[in-house]
Amino acid sequence: MVMVRITRVHTGGGDAGETSLVDGSRVSKSDDRIEIVGTCDEVNALLGLVLMETSRLPDNHPDGGARTTVRRVKDVCLAALGRMQSELFDLGAELACPPDQIPEYMQLVDQEDSDRLCEEMDAWNEELEPLESFILPTGSGPIAAMHLARTV
């Protein structure tokens, strides 16, 4: 895979309300594609927050007993969330290309990736008790961060 080297985080080229796509062409910052790229970036940052908050949770109770739920989240969900972050990054890069000019080296998010995500959500949902009401967005740091990510 070819990595793009970013030498600075701003160019000043967007000051007139336009931004550049991967091929250098210019589009309005209000273009739907740019909105979606921004949403991918926002969800990606929020998943990073979930990962950071989850990594802070202790594996054991103060009495020394195992916290099996925390360990399960760390073992199963963190790997999936990390993969989702990579896929969101890939999706944002793909969206920042004109459809007919996607570089061959670019990693694309495909139907298999989408199907895997749906299968994971279905499997996780099977483990939950049936919901009888809406869930208030409260709880520990990882839970609050996940609620925030869910709203984007």
Where does each model-flagged region fall?
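Phosphate/pyrophosphate-binding loop motifs in nucleotide- or prenyl diphosphate-using proteins
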Residues: 1-152
